[in-house]
Amino acid sequence: MADRVLVIGSGGREHALAWKLAQSPHVKQVFVAPGNAGTANSGKISNSAVSVSNHAALAQFCRDQEIRLVVVGPEVPLAAGIVDDLTAAGVRCFGPTARAAQLESSKSFTKSFLDRHGIPTARWKSFTDPKAACSFINSANFPALVVKASGLAAGKGVIVASNKEEACKAVNDIMQDKTFGTAGETVVVEELLEGEEVSCLCFTDGVTIAPMPPAQDHKRLKDGDEGPNTGGMGAYSPAPQISKDLLLKIRETVLQKTLDGMRKEGIPYLGVLYAGLMLTKDGPKVLEFNCRFGDPECQVILPLLKSDLYEVMQAVINKKLSSSMPIWYEDSAAVTVVMASEGYPGTYPKGLEITGLSKAKELGLEVFHAGTALKDGKVVTNGGRVLTVTAIKEDLMTALQEANKGVAAINFKGSIYRKDIGYRAIAFLSQSRGLTYKNSGVDIAAGNILVQKIKPLAAATSRSGCNAELGGFAGLFDLKAAGYKDPILVSGTDGVGTKLKIAQVCKKHDTIGQDLVAMCVNDILAQGAEPLFFLDYFACGKLDVEVAQGVIAGIAEACQKAGCALLGGETAEMPGMYPPGEYDLAGFAVGAVERGQMLPQLERIADGDVVIGVASSGVHSNGYSLVRRIVEKSSLDFSSQVGVSGDQTLGDLLLTPTKIYSKTLLPVLRSGHVKAYAHITGGGLLENIPRVLPDSFGVVLDALSWKIPEIFCWLHKEGNLSEEEMARTFNCGIGAVLVVQKELAQQVLKDVQKHEAAWLIGKVVPLQKGSAHVKVHNLLQALQANRSLSVHSHIQGKIQTNKVKVAVLISGTGTNLEALINSTKKPTSFAEIVLVVSNKAGVEGLRKAERAGIPTRVIDHKQYGSRTEFDSAVDRVLEEFSVELICLAGFMRILSGPFVKKWEGKILNIHPSLLPSFKGANAHKLVLEAGVRVTGCTVHFVAEEVDAGAIIFQEAVPVKIGDTVETLSERVKEAEHRAFPAALQLVASGAVQVGEAGKICWK
């Protein structure tokens, strides 16, 4: 049976949505509210006069009309919670919740979110004070010329200034002259990026994303991108500037990362996500997010959709998008041209007759109405952007020509439109018709850019014997200049292994270079050699300059730590050899040792010699195939928070770089006191120590003599590994061992301990026939002992308990709110503020929350007939945000009995006296009248009787001679700012609960 659908909105986007939905065999009728002339009585499509701002009335309309799907076009209803309210009323609605829609409705929230999740964007800062904003513009070390109203401003709240004076004027226009009203109470000032702007949209069910063909909008009013900024004068799709590889990168580094980040923050995002991007020389960077289809992008993207839009949207709502991925027409291009009223984007006339619409249709074009209306049976203008003419052809040039023919056929007085929509794409295509090396996948220009970026990094590693200058055919090293008399050259080569896989998954490329250098230079130390120079090999399928620069910067920094020069290297771009986003590394180190100082000195090693163990920094660079398998089988992933303060991920911990020992151990090795040095690398303790021993000797080690890092304890437990497997695969906390004479052991140990953690861990013993070269005693006990060293184990069990989600209810300035925000931002906090609710609009507390990137909702108590109705509205929002605790911070409403009962033991309030004394609203006045010498504040659970709940925390404040209500109030407020966060921490941690009979229960 076919369904009815309701589309919310009145523009060209909504006409296009209705047009596409009406093509579905599952749909029998499409209502558009309020709609326009194009959606009035057009086949399956008709307009509705239902109020879209009254969500209760809208929900009733949907029930009465048996609406099976509501599709929200514009951003304002999304920010107002239309999806939340309709969904709560049992109406299926396509689009994000109000909380998720903050990605568009609060630019301050969005920029903070992007920074939190490492998604590339312009440098920025938000302000509520215009003077501070202008000071930032004038002092920033980058062009801070983009000024944005943080809130919704109908797509016009962004000013791109040409100089600092213009930027400051924009700030004052927005904040003082209220150009965009309340949307400009907070402004974001950000870096002016250079590049080409594109739009990348996707469908998403919160987990899976389905990218749409990339598009490009044209914001300026006139040809050649001249004139004022508008809501958009035309668009085209697909944008050929975005290659398949680049689109894949955008999908992974922007779209998927955004959805994953929202989900991790407890804000699942469903609907359409629109990323406005700048294609900079450093890669794509996010300019903005929209939480719906763009207008006019929608009018060029939907005509390219081969699939049933109704089915796709239902799959999104059902969270089954992966089983209903949309299919797009491959060999087609779409161009849409906007026709606007004379005077737009300023004031413009209305009611002008539009003719020629049927001629455009006869040309095979789609005309999507926007600012149109019906008057006396005629179509007339009723807005700034009046309509869009869309052509779908086999290529962009033809589509633009056809769209312009349609525009020429349509007429209304004073119409304005652009004739150059898609000019950037046409220029791009005309430059890239011939087959090139770059077309084949090798970008020589990108390689040259990389060389220029890394030249100064290599130059910084210069040392005696060579100047590290890249770009030649080979590098030179002068041993005599380095101070050598009779040297032996020593070389070593190595890679990083599958630790690279973790770096690539975590997109952390800045430390893997140290692993590469360490693996090579630590090896040649086994011959007693000083590392002189290093060469690297970086191989990939597609060169990402930013990634490669990060890796090589890490290599250069590591060379400085090792004391060797980065003399050269090879960057190999080989299309088809590696999957997108993957690369491989290899390194080659050359060192030297004077002929008489070479190691190991096998003939000197004797029974009773002592083994000194030098601490590793962690797993180093071996055993990662096993590590990855253990993580896959565990309950954790690489993004799981670990550490005492939860400020590190498991991926970060596993990517701790390998220690470089050359500078710290070389003086000891040259002292003549060390008989052998072994680098504990692949093969662990069992395989590496025998490499520097005579065949007739082995070693016995005591694992209880050194500290084993807890990462090994976790791997042992989680992987159910045997002692032998641990010792044969991992370094178990020992990165290198030295063999020294027993009588010199303490002296050598002290010398090593000046720079590294080290222990006496064993001794050399004669090897019995058939015996193992290395025996490690007490390894199991050491692993178990170290695993229980601390309650706050780095890796044990559930590494960091999930923070309790808190809502703060306010009515005013939010001074206590600010204290709560500051305390919950600390890594040690057990609480996280996920929502601030005010019963009054425009109060300072809301602005404080927005600056902190915390979602806000205004629920005006005056709009409800009773306390119970108001509390029910609050309760629905709390459930939407999965709130677990409530803090009342200057909330000037008495909560109803049913609400208090539902949230019993979950609501905290603060009172400005030491309860049970001086209850009520005038506590300070009562204190002064009573003549008491001590007052204070009390944090308590809320009960039905005012100020009568169980007391959690109190702080005393002296009453001074001459105190007034004002002076006493200020002193008590300071105590409140300490007491409220302390009480919240007690409750959120579970240390304090409400027990039987409403009494406090301490755990």
Swiss-Prot record:
Pathway: Purine metabolism; IMP biosynthesis via de novo pathway; 5-amino-1-(5-phospho-D-ribosyl)imidazole from N(2)-formyl-N(1)-(5-phospho-D-ribosyl)glycinamide: step 2/2; Purine metabolism; IMP biosynthesis via de novo pathway; N(1)-(5-phospho-D-ribosyl)glycinamide from 5-phospho-alpha-D-ribose 1-diphosphate: step 2/2; Purine metabolism; IMP biosynthesis via de novo pathway; N(2)-formyl-N(1)-(5-phospho-D-ribosyl)glycinamide from N(1)-(5-phospho-D-ribosyl)glycinamide (10-formyl THF route): step 1/1. Residues 434-805 are annotated as: AIRS domain. Mg(2+) binds at E288, N290. N(1)-(5-phospho-beta-D-ribosyl)glycinamide binds at G814, T815, N816, K973, E974, A975, E976. Residues 111-318 form the ATP-grasp domain. One of its GO terms (molecular function) is phosphoribosylformylglycinamidine cyclo-ligase activity. The active site is at H911 (proton donor). Gene3D superfamilies: 3.40.50.20, ATP-grasp fold, A domain, ATP-grasp fold, B domain, Formyl transferase, N-terminal domain, Phosphoribosylglycinamide synthetase, C-terminal domain, PurM-like C-terminal domain, PurM-like, N-terminal domain. Residues 214-235 are annotated as: Disordered. Its cofactor is Mg(2+); Mn(2+). The keyword Membrane does not apply. The record marks D947 as: Raises pKa of active site His. Keywords: ATP-binding, Ligase, Magnesium, Manganese, Metal-binding, Multifunctional enzyme, Nucleotide-binding, Purine biosynthesis, Transferase. (6R)-10-formyltetrahydrofolate binds at R867, M892, R893, I894, L895, N909, A943, E944, E945, V946, D947. Residues 806-1003 are annotated as: GART domain. It catalyses: 5-phospho-beta-D-ribosylamine + glycine + ATP = N(1)-(5-phospho-beta-D-ribosyl)glycinamide + ADP + phosphate + H(+); 2-formamido-N(1)-(5-O-phospho-beta-D-ribosyl)acetamidine + ATP = 5-amino-1-(5-phospho-beta-D-ribosyl)imidazole + ADP + phosphate + H(+); N(1)-(5-phospho-beta-D-ribosyl)glycinamide + (6R)-10-formyltetrahydrofolate = N(2)-formyl-N(1)-(5-phospho-beta-D-ribosyl)glycinamide + (6S)-5,6,7,8-tetrahydrofolate + H(+). Disulfide bonds: none annotated. Its EC number is 6.3.4.13, 6.3.3.1, 2.1.2.2. Residues 216-225 have a biased composition (Basic and acidic residues). Trifunctional enzyme that catalyzes three distinct reactions as part of the 'de novo' inosine monophosphate biosynthetic pathway. The N-terminal ATP-grasp domain carries the phosphoribosylamine--glycine ligase activity. The central AIRS domain carries the phosphoribosylformylglycinamidine cyclo-ligase activity. In the N-terminal section; belongs to the GARS family. In the central section; belongs to the AIR synthase family. Homodimer. This is Trifunctional purine biosynthetic protein adenosine-3.
